[in-house]
Amino acid sequence: MHKTAIYPGTFDPLTNGHMDIIRRASMIFDTLIVAVAKSATKEPMFPLSEREEMLRLATRECPSVRVESFDTLLADFAQERGACILVRGLRAVSDFEYELQMGYANASLNPALETIYLMPSLQNAFISSSVIRSILLHKGKISHLVPPVVCEYIQKRRSCM
């Protein structure tokens, strides 16, 4: 049976932690849709089109990965794509409470939808997009925190490093 999973997020920007989860989830599922959220509640540093492009560049050698954007309820997006599994990353206990609530909310909207949680590898456990945005705002180095193609993309587009 073909299993399609969705890994949703704002990916503002894509981190090594995100890529860790993407690589591992893509080995578990037949198709992994990395779903870039057009967030109504967050003001992103990078526009949706740039976040999608960074993901496409970083996942171009992952044949089972598709990058798509969405601005609907995640449960509806999953149903439209025939996905029955959501993949979420957990870095710390503080992530768990939020993710548990979101998992229950999505299951209440789509009872066929399961959420699985993957922990990033230890070297990526501290990385978050918000930390990277803060470093970028202060013109710091991010090359050890993001995939090389993302670092190059940001350097070319933002000239802020």
Swiss-Prot record:
Site (Transition state stabilizer): H18
Pathway: Cofactor biosynthesis; coenzyme A biosynthesis; CoA from (R)-pantothenate: step 4/5
InterPro entries: Cyt_trans-like, PPAT, Rossmann-like_a/b/a_fold
Coiled-coil regions listed: none
HAMAP family in alphabetical order: PPAT_bact
Subunit structure: Homohexamer.
Compartments (UniProt record): Cytoplasm
Function, as annotated: Reversibly transfers an adenylyl group from ATP to 4'-phosphopantetheine, yielding dephospho-CoA (dPCoA) and pyrophosphate.
GO cellular component, one term: cytoplasm
Top-level EC class as recorded in UniProt: transferase
Main location: cytoplasm
Positions annotated to bind substrate: T10, K42, L74, R88
GO terms (BP aspect): coenzyme A biosynthetic process
Binding positions (ATP): T10, F11, H18, G89, L90, R91, E99, N124, A125, F126, I127, S128, S129, S130
Alphabetical UniProt keywords: ATP-binding, Coenzyme A biosynthesis, Cytoplasm, Magnesium, Nucleotide-binding, Nucleotidyltransferase, Transferase
Family affiliation: Belongs to the bacterial CoaD family.
Protein source organism: Wolinella succinogenes (strain ATCC 29543 / DSM 1740 / CCUG 13145 / JCM 31913 / LMG 7466 / NCTC 11488 / FDC 602W)
Top-rank taxon: Bacteria
Cofactor(s) the record lists: Mg(2+)
Reaction(s) this enzyme catalyzes, per UniProt: (R)-4'-phosphopantetheine + ATP + H(+) = 3'-dephospho-CoA + diphosphate
The protein's name: Phosphopantetheine adenylyltransferase
EC number, as in UniProt: 2.7.7.3
Single GO MF descriptor: pantetheine-phosphate adenylyltransferase activity
